């Protein structure tokens, strides 16, 4: 399923809307405190939700999910498009602190279930609402 055609302009638009709608309620509870600490990255904990939402919007034929464990042994998620372009909406949690995301260890993955899937749906509804008003 594709909600919107996949092209550079739509990718930029949707990426901005996704990032603008990332809020603490979309982070697993275990990560919320880490984000609230002074100097913490506001992107930490959002990588699965943001990446999965992007895939839901543009479809699995256009966007694939990838993940790898980082230097803290925590999973990091990002997307790769049909042309092999890496799309990481939450990369600032690494680059903003002088670290590199674990792309070199990336493996294809699927959307997580349970609470993760619910958070993706909440974000997707927010993004759809913005897109409907454009």
Predicted feature residues:
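A structural boundary/capping signal
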Residues: 1-134
